A protein has these predicted regions:
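Bacterial N-terminal signal peptides
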Residues: 14-24
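Targeting-peptide/extracellular-domain and disordered-appendage signature
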Residues: 2-6, 28-99, 104-189
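Twin-arginine (Tat) signal peptide motif
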Residues: 9-11
Length: 189
């Protein structure tokens, strides 16, 4: 016994066939996971909350600094959207004052000299192109460290004391430590 097709059943069949073709037409990679995962780290230092949101590129066997990331050029330490760091109170970064707010971080890696960390007030930008000096709030010279390798870029706080901490930007065998002092104290009641 054969079922009679109605105009409605033909439309449903045609729509289902079109959906199947459309799904099959996309390459598997475009339906998969993003190549760089998003990460977030938060840390309280004394009475100051610090939050960092960033993309985590993966080394995938590539030579990183001096190759993938050229020397002496502004580089965004992350993937996709620029790394955002938020402080709810004023802090000192490497001894230099920074007002509470939301910022992005940029680096200038150097082969034989301290690296430059750039703090920019351009808070909601993509990682390319660099938004420019007109948005810069601070430039810090920091000496990178040679450390155990990590495959995925990571930002973390390996040291947290009473009112100070070290935030480390780490990829491959290189880590850039940034000293943070959080002097804010609430008024006694």
């Amino acid at each position: 016994m054969q079922m009679k097709q109605t105009p409605k059943s033909r439309r449903v069949y045609c729509a289902a066939a079109c959906m199947a073709v459309a799904v099959a037409a996309f390459p598997a990679g475009s339906q998969g996971y993003p190549p760089s995962q998003r990460g977030t780290v938060t840390q309280n230092v004394a009475f100051t909350a610090i939050s960092v949101t960033y993309g985590r590129p993966v080394a995938r066997g590539r030579e990183l600094f001096g190759a993938l990331v050229p020397w002496d050029s502004v580089w965004h330490p992350c993937a996709d959207s620029a790394t955002r760091v938020t402080f709810n109170h004023d802090v000192l970064l490497e001894g230099k004052p920074l007002r509470a707010g939301e910022y992005t971080l940029w680096l200038i890696p150097r082969e034989h000299a301290p690296w430059t960390v750039i703090v920019s007030r351009a808070a909601h930008v993509f990682h390319k192109p660099y938004p420019g000096e007109r948005f810069e709030v601070l430039r810090l010279d920091v000496t990178p460290e040679q450390v155990s390798p990590v495959e995925s870029f990571a930002i973390y706080f390996p040291m947290v004391l009473r009112d100070e901490a070290v935030m480390r930007l780490h990829w491959g065998t290189t880590a850039v430590p940034i000293r943070i002092k959080a002097p804010f104290k609430p008024e006694p009641r």
